Amino acid sequence: MENFTALFGAQTDPPPPPSALGFGPGKPPPPPPPPPGGGPGAAPPSTATSAPAGADKSTAGSGPFYLMRELPGSTELTGSTNLITHYNLEQAYNKFCGKKVKEKLSNFLPDLPGMIDLPGSHDNSSLRSLIEKPPILGGSFNPITGTMLSGFRLHTGPLPEQCRLMHIQPPKKKNKHKHKQSRTQDPVPPETPSDSDHKKKKKKKEEDPERKRKKKEKKKKKNRHSPDHPGMGSSQASSSSSLR
C-alpha cells in the first residue's frame, strides 16, 4: 500500500458541494455517460432537430427552416387601385379640385418660355405631338468645321463700357434711427433766423418790468438785514435803552 501511494500519490478528498459554501442548493451529480458499445438499456439517438426555447411547437419538427413564416395573403389595395373611388371621395374631390383658378399658370411660372396658359395641342408643342409627328431632319450629321468653331472661342480684349461697372456694387445707404415721435407727427418747418430773433426780442420786452420789480424787492430785503443799514442801529439802541 505504501508503494502504491508513493507511485500515484495520496488520494485527494472530493470538493465540497455548493450548498456547503453558501452559493445555492446542491444539485445531484450528472449521470455517468453510457458505455461506448451500448447496452440493453441504452436509447437510440434522436434524429429530429430540437427547436430552441421560445419557438412554436408546431414548427419544431419541420426541419432546419422553422423560422420561415407563411406568405402574406392577397390584398385589395395595390398600386393600381384608385383610392378616390375606393374610399368614395369623388364628391369631395370634385368640390375642392374642380373649381377654376382665377390666376393663370404663367403667373406662377414667369420664367418659362412659350405660351404656358394654352394647351400644347394648339401650337403643336406637346410631347405627344412630337412622338406622333416627329420633325423632318436630315439623314446624317455633319461635323463642325474649324471656321465654325471659331465662333465659340473666347478672345482677349477690352470690356465694353456698359459692362465695366457691373461687378462694382453700389454703397449701401445707412438709415439712421429716428425717434418715434418724428414719424407720427408732421414735420415742423425750419424757422428763419429773422423770425427767431424777433420772437426772442418780444419775450425780453414782456419779461423786463416783472424782472425789475422782483429785483427791487430783493434789494430791499437785503438792505433791511444788512448791518450797514442806518435803520438797524437806531432800532438796536432803542431796544437796549428799554431794557435798562
Swiss-Prot record:
Residues 1-67, 171-244 are annotated as: Disordered. Its main location: nucleus. Pfam families: Med19. It is found in: Nucleus. One of its GO terms (molecular function) is transcription coregulator activity. This is Mediator of RNA polymerase II transcription subunit 19. It comes from Mus musculus (Mouse). The keyword Phosphoprotein applies. Residues 26-38 have a biased composition (Pro residues).
